Amino acid sequence: MDQEVMDFFDFSKELNRVPGAPQGYISSDPWLMATESKSSEVPNRETIGTDYVTKIVAKEKCRLNRTLLEYQPQGKRNRTLDDLDTDDEAEETEIRRDDEYYKKFRFNLNRDKNLSIYAKREEILAAINAHPVIIIKGETGCGKTTQVPQYILDEAYKSGKYCNIVVTQPRRIAAISIANRVCQEREWQQNTVCSFQVGLHRPNSLEDTRLLYCTTGVLLNNLINNKTLTHYTHIVLDEVHERDQNMDFLLIVVRRLLATNSRHVKIILMSATIDAKELSDYFATTNSIPPVITTNHGRKHSIEKFYRDQLGSIIWNEEDVGDQHVPEINKHGYRAAVKIIVIIDNMERKAAIQSRLSYDETLRYGAVLIFLPGIYEIDTMAENITCMLENDRNIKVLIVRCFSLMTPENQRDVFNPPPPGFRKIILATNIAESSITVPDVSYVIDFCLTKVKVTDTASSFSSLRLTWASKANCRQRAGRVGRLRSGRVYRMVNKHFYQREMAEFGIPEMLRLPLQNSVLKAKVLNMGSPMEILALALSPPNLSDIQNTILLLKEVGALYLTVDGVYDALDGDLTYWGTIMARLPLDTRQSRLIILGYIFNMLEEAIIIAAGLSTNGLFAHDGGRTQLGDSFWMHYIFADGSGSDLVAIWRVYLTYLSLVEIGHDQESAIRWAKRFHVSLRSLKEIHLLVQELRVRCMHLGLIPFSVNPSQMMDDREKAIMLKVIIAGAFYPNYFTRSKDTCADTDRNIYQTISGHDPCRTVYFTNFKPAYMGELYTRRIKELFQEVRIPPENMDVTFQEGSQKVFVTFKQDDWIADSSKFVPVSGRVQSEVYKAVMMRQNRLERPIHIMNPSAFMSYVQQRGIGDVIEGRWIPPTKPLNVELLALPSVFDKTISGLITCIVSCGKFFFQPQSFAECIGNMSEIFNAPQQLRNYVNNAGDITKGMMVLAKRDSYFQRATVIRPENQSNRQPMFYVRFIDYGDCALLSMQQMRLMPRELTEQYGDLPPRVFECRLAMVQPSSMVSGNNRWSTAANDMLRSVAKSGLIDIEVYSLFNNVAAVLIYMRDGIINDKLVELMLCRRSDEDYMSRKDHDFRLRRQESARYLSSAQRQQINEEYMRSCQLPEDHDLRPPPPEKCKTVVILKGPYSPLECTMQCITRVGSSKRVNIDHLSVNALLLDADPQDHHDHLIVAHEIAENRNGHTLTARGTTLMPNVQGFGALMVMLFSPTMQLKCNREGTSYVSVLGGLGCDPETNEPYFPEHDVLINLDVNILEDDVILINQIRYYIDSVFFNFKDENNPAVSANERVSIYTQLRSIINRLLCKDRRYIERNMSNADFEWETHPDLPPPNEPFGKRAIFPMHSLTELQEEDTGRLVQLRENCSMLHKWRNVEGTLPHMTCKLCNQLLDSVPQLRLHLLTILHRDREKQIDYCNQ
C-alpha cells in the first residue's frame, strides 16, 4: 500500500499537508473563510450625548416655577410635554380634618431625645411647612428614618389635620423591619397606623394606615398608575443617595407631578451621604430653594486615617509605586497590605506591654477588615497573606472571606470570634460596606477600589469594570471600625489623589445599566416620549442610550416598530407585551420568558426560572481558588443532563418546595442545603418572588389552564418546549458550539488519543517513555480520587515513544456507583467532565517515580515482565485472536441470535456458527458432577471471578461483577453471563463454583458473543433525552430479536463493538426507526468510517486471495483492533520513588469553543461562566457535524472588550437546524438568503430589519446570522409563520382596547396547534447541504418584485409574517459538472497513490489525500448531496 495512505492511518505520526493548495483559500474550513468577511464588522454609529436635555429641562423648570408660584387648575388633560400642566383630577386645596381617626388610636408624643435627629426636630418641621421640598442629611444611626415621619405625624395629631405619609426604602427587609420597629416603639398594633408594603405584600386594608413604609418600586408604580401625588400629604424618599434607576425615575415622577397637579404635597429627601447641592438644584425654583438640614452624631471611639504617602517607605519602596492613577492592585499592593498587618501586630504587642490588657485579649477585638473589589482579588490576597506569614510563626491569623455568593457557614465565620491566639482577617467585597456590621473590627485596609457593572446599550453586553470607589463608599467603609474601641483606617492611595481626584459619589445606575424598565415606565406614565421623560432625570442618559434601549424593547416585543404607523427611532407604541413587562419586577427578557411560558402553558416553570435568574447566589460558593468540592457538580445533578442552568434552577426550587410542603424543620433544611451546596437564603428569596409573580400574573390575566390528561405533555416534550421558550425569551443571546469542518478534524481527535474512544478518554502529558509508565498505573489512578472516580473504573495505557498517558473510563452501567453518577448530555461520559475539571482547577500534578537508572534492576529482581535486549516488556495476557467471536474483516453479513438487548446502542449478538459450541458447553456445565460446588460462604465469591450461574433453567459461564450493596438480607451478586452478554442479580443458591478442570478448559475462552450497536443512527432528542434510546425504539428491536434467527450487516468494528444494520422482512430496522421518527440519521465517527472503508476494500479483494492469506490478514486485523491493556502492576514502594515527575492535564480532545452569532459578538472570544453546567464545554456528539445552539440568559464582556462570558446558559436540543429555526421563529424579521445560483437557501439573517429606502439595518449590532447545514424549505417557513401567527394572536388587542381579544377556549385551541406545529417542525428528517459563505452575509437585501406577505394583524404584529424568495431550478450545466466531479471522486477512491489537490464541489470540501477522500464519500453530507443531484455511482 502507498506509504502516504499508511501514514494517514498511523496515529503515531503527525499528518503533514502537501503544499500547493489552490490560491485564494485560507483553509478547507468555510467557517475560517467567513472570518475574512468585512460585513461582520459592526458599522460605527454616532454617539449622541446629552445636548437634547437643555431645552426639555428649561421647559420643565418654567412649569415648576409657574405651578409652585400660583396653582391654576386646567380642565383639559394633555399628553405632550409642551402643554402638560395638570391632570384631570384637580388637587384638593382644602385642609382636611381627621379628628375621629386620632381618637381611635393612642398617640404618645414622647420621642427619643437621645437621638441626634431630635435636636433638629423643630427646624425640620418648620422647613416642611415653609417649603415644598426639603433635604435632610443625617449620618447612619441618627434616627432620621424612624423619627422624622413620626415628627410629622405628631404635628398632624396636635392640629387634627389629615396626614398620610409614605416613606420609601431601597430594600424589602428594611421597609419591613423599620415599620415593625415604629409599631413597637409607639405600641401600635401592626398594620394599623403604621404598616409596610413590599412588592404585593401589604395589609388587606390600608384604611387606617397613616405611615406606610414601602420599597421604592412600590411607590413608583403607584404614582405612575395614579399620575398624582395627592394620595399622600408627605412623601419621604429615604436613602436617596443610592441612585438606582427606581429612585432616579421616582424623582422624575415626583418633580413632574409636583409641577402639574400636586403642589401641596410635601417632599422630604433623606440620606447619610447625599449630594445635597445637586438635589437642591434639581428641585429649586425661582421662589424656593430646598433647604438642607444636616445632623451628625458623635462617635464614642476615635478613628485615625492613614494614606499611602503617609506610610512612606514603611510598606512601599520607591520602585514599587507604579502608576497610582490606574485602578488595579499589583503584587506590591498585596505585599504592602501584608506589611500593614505585621505592623498592626507589632504595634499591639507593644501596646499590650503598657496596658492592662493581654495581647490575646487585644486579638479578640483587633480584627482586620480588608476591602477588595472581587473574589479573584480576595483569593490573591489570601495567598499573599499565607505565603508571607509562613516565615513569621509568631503571627497567627484566621482568614475569613466575605462576599455575596458565600455559603451561610462561611458567613457565620465572619461574626464568630477567632481561636485563642489568632487574629481574624476578613477579606471582603463592598458587601461589608453596609450590609453587615462586624463589631470586633478595629482596622480597615481599603484599596479604594470597586467593581461596577456597566452595560453597553448597543450590544447589551455587561461588564464588571474595576474602578476607583467614591469617597462616599470609602467613608462607609471607614465607618466599619470604632464600634468597640478606637480604630484605624489605611487607605492604599495617596491623600492628594483621594481628596482631589476620586469622585465624591458613584455613577448612578441610569448612566451605566440597561434602561429598558425606565423607558417602559415612561411609556406607561404617558406624559411624553421616553426621550422627554428621561431628559428630566437627575443624571440624564445619553440620547444614544435611549435610542438603543428603544431598539432593544422593539426586539423583545415591548414596543411596536412604529408610532401611529410611522417608524420612529426614538419611540414606539406600547404593545400588550410591553404592558406586562412594565408591571413585572423583572428584566424584560425574564418577563418575555413568562409571557412565552403563558402562551405554551408552562407559566409555572417560567415564573420559577425568572425568579431564580433575578436572585443571586442560589448555588453557594465555598470560597478559595483551589477548592474542587461537590458544589460544582451539584449544578449537573440538578440540571439532570439537560445542559441548562435554567433547568437546574427550576429543579432546585421544586426540591426545596417539596421539603417545605412535607414540613421539614429548619435544621433539616440547613442540612439539605449544605449537602447540595445551595443557599437557603436565596431559595427563600426566590420563593417570595415566585409567590409575588404568581399574584401579579393573576392580576394581568396570565393564568395557566388545565388540559385533558391525554393532551398533557410528557417529560420529554416538556423539556423540548421549555428549551424552545428559553430560546425565544433570550433571543438573540445565541451561540454555536463551534465545529471545525476541516476534513482532518476527526482524524486529529483520534490521533491525539492514539485511537482510543474520545468519549471515554483523557490524557496527561510530560511522562517520558523512559519512566516505564506501566509500573505506575495505580499511582496515576489515585490522582482521580479528588473527583471520586474509583480506580477500578478506569484503564491507564501508554503509547510507545510518546509522552502521553491515556486514561480510559469504563463504560459499564453495572459497575458504576449510581450515587456518584453525574448526568451529562450526549455521548461523553461524566468522568471525562470530572477529569477536565481537575485540570482547570490545577494544571500540574506531581507523581513520584523511581530513578530511571535503577529501574531495570528493580523489575529483574522481582521478575516483573521480561527484559529483552535492554528493553523492558511488561507482563501481558496471551491473546489467541482465532478464538475471538468478533466478525472477520471479510464478513459482511452474519446470521445469528440477539441474546441480550440493553438498548439500540448496546446489544449482544451470537453468531449461528457458535450454536454447536454453545450447546456442547451448556451440556457440560449442567452435568450433575459439575454442579456440586455450592457457594456456602459469600467470602468465597470475589470480583471478576468466573462461576457457573443460573440463566433461565440452565447454568452458564458468568463473571462476578460486584456484590449487591444492601446488607439487610442474604448476600446477592451481580453477574454477567459471558456467552450471552446479559447481567443478573443472583443469590448464592443460584451460583456454583466452577470446577478446576472446567476453569482450565474454558477460563480463557473469549465470549461467544460480541457487542453491537445500530449503525448510522443515533437517538432523537425529540423522543428521548441524554443520548438514551427511547422505549419504543428498544421495543422494536426486541420484537425483531424475538423472531429468532436474523441477519446483520457489519458496518464497522471499533473498540470490539460492531456497528451493524439489521435486516427485517420489510427492510432494515435502522431505516425503519428513522422513518418512524424514533431516531435520526447520523454520521459514523472517524474510526468507524475508517474501519468500514478498510473492510469494504478487503471484501472487494477477497476473491483474489487464498484461504491462508485471508486468515493471515484477518489475524492482523483482529490484533490491530485490540487496544493496549492496563497492566495494573503494583508500584515500587514509596521509599524507592524519590524522583518527582509533573504530569500536565488531564486533557480531552473534545474540548471546544463557542462562537457568538450576533454581529457585535461574532469576532470576540467566548467563555462560559465558570459556575455554569456548560463551563466544561465538550463536543458531546463528536460524530455529529452540526453546530449546536447555546442560549445565554446574560452576556458579559471583559474590560478590554475582546472576550465575552455567557451566563445562565442552556444547551439546546441536538436537532438538525435548531438554531436556524429558532432565529426564524423568534427574530422580529428575517431573510432566508440563497446561494449564488438561487437554487437553495444557505443562510438565515435575523434582526429588526432595515430601512426599506437605504437598506441600512435598524439595529446592526443585534443582527444574527446562521449559515445552514441542512435544507430549509418553503414548507418550514409556512409552519414558522403559523407559529408566529398563533403567538401573536394570544395577546392581540385592537387599538384603544386594554385587554386581549382571545377567549379561554380559543387559547386552548391555540396551545394545541402550537404544540402540534412545533413538533412537526422539529421532527423533520432534514437533508444535509454544503456550507456556503458570502461577503454580504450581514447585508439586508431588497427584493422589489417580492409581494409583501399577508399580515393578519397589520402593523400591530409583534411577529410579522416572513416573506420568501422563490428558488430557481438547478441549471442543467451545473448538474452535469457536479455529477462529473462525483464520478471523478469515486474513481480516485480505488487509487493507491498520491491525490492531486481536489475539491468535492457538492460539499465545498477540499481533499488532500486518497484516505481523506474515501472517508468523505461515506459521510451523510456527501451521500445526501449525491441524492440531491440524482447521482448514481456505477
Swiss-Prot record:
This enzyme's EC code(s): 3.6.4.13
Helicase ATP-binding domain span:
125-292
Enzyme class per UniProt: hydrolase
Please indicate if the UniProt record lists ATP-binding as a keyword: yes
PROSITE patterns attached here?
A: HELICASE_ATP_BIND_1, HELICASE_CTER, TUDOR
| Catalytic activity of the protein | ATP + H2O = ADP + phosphate + H(+)
All residue ranges annotated as the Tudor domain in the record: 938-1001
Query: Which keywords accompany this UniProt record?
Result: ATP-binding, Cytoplasm, Developmental protein, Differentiation, Helicase, Hydrolase, Meiosis, Nucleotide-binding, Oogenesis, RNA-mediated gene silencing, Spermatogenesis
Q: Which GO terms describe its biological process?
A: dorsal appendage formation; germarium-derived oocyte fate determination; global gene silencing by mRNA cleavage; heterochromatin formation; intracellular mRNA localization; mitotic chromosome condensation; oocyte karyosome formation; oocyte localization involved in germarium-derived egg chamber formation
- What GO molecular function annotation could you give as one example from this UniProt entry? RNA helicase activity
Q: Where is the Helicase C-terminal domain?
A: 339-526
Spell out the PANTHER family in the cross-references. Answer: ATP-DEPENDENT RNA HELICASE (PTHR18934), ATP-DEPENDENT RNA HELICASE TDRD9 (PTHR18934:SF113)
- Quote the function comment for this protein: Probable ATP-binding RNA helicase which plays a central role during spermatogenesis and oogenesis by repressing transposable elements and preventing their mobilization, which is essential for the germline integrity. Acts via the piRNA metabolic process, which mediates the repression of transposable elements during meiosis by forming complexes composed of piRNAs and Piwi and govern the methylation and subsequent repression of transposons. Involved in the repression of LTR retrotransposon copia.
Q: Tell me the protein's name.
A: Probable ATP-dependent RNA helicase spindle-E
